[in-house]
């Protein structure tokens, strides 16, 4: 079984240095390309979006860059964004980085299916990232005339009010 990388504010090597066949112009770093794109699109800061949503706004010292693992090697500890990237990001964290940093605050113990009784603490999307993803899915479903939301607008999940994406995937897989 191939597990995905955890959500965090670090970038794996293949994304830090994209091949020239993918990134024909500089920079070759996907994270840097995303940050520049967000700047050019005029995306609001993560803190601005959290405030507009009425959810907890992360403080600068809670927005950490680095790997989010249980056993952090010495010298690889995550560091606050302002210390890593400068005061320009004080109360002004790029939205993409904010969403990734938010996952450090929201973790869940998950059982590893291939090992008996072993669980890991895994990050999950927080209020800002989770809501953006949910609204994109809902927008796609409302935009699809064959979607259940358009076919039967009064439909509600049989599982009740607490129906998660995990439940939806399990249902789709027949579990």
Which role does the model predict for each range below?
Residues 1-175:
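Terminal regions of secretory-pathway proteins
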């Amino acid at each position: 079984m191939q597990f995905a990388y955890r959500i965090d504010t670090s970038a794996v090597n293949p994304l830090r240095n994209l091949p020239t066949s993918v990134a024909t112009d500089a920079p070759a770093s996907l994270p840097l390309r995303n940050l520049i794109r967000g700047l050019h699109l005029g995306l609001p800061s993560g803190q601005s979006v959290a405030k507009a949503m009425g959810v907890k706004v992360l403080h600068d010292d809670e927005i950490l860059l680095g790997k989010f693992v249980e056993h952090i090697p010495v010298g690889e500890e995550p560091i606050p964004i302002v210390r890593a990237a400068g005061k320009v990001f004080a109360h002004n964290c790029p939205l993409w980085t904010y969403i990734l940093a938010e996952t450090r605050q929201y973790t869940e113990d998950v059982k590893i299916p291939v090992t008996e009784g072993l669980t890991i603490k895994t990050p999950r999307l927080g209020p800002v990232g989770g809501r953006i993803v949910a609204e994109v899915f809902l927008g796609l479903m409302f935009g699809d005339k064959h979607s259940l939301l358009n076919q039967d607008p009064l439909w509600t999940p049989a599982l009740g009010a607490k129906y998660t994406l995990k439940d939806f995937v399990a249902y789709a897989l027949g579990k």
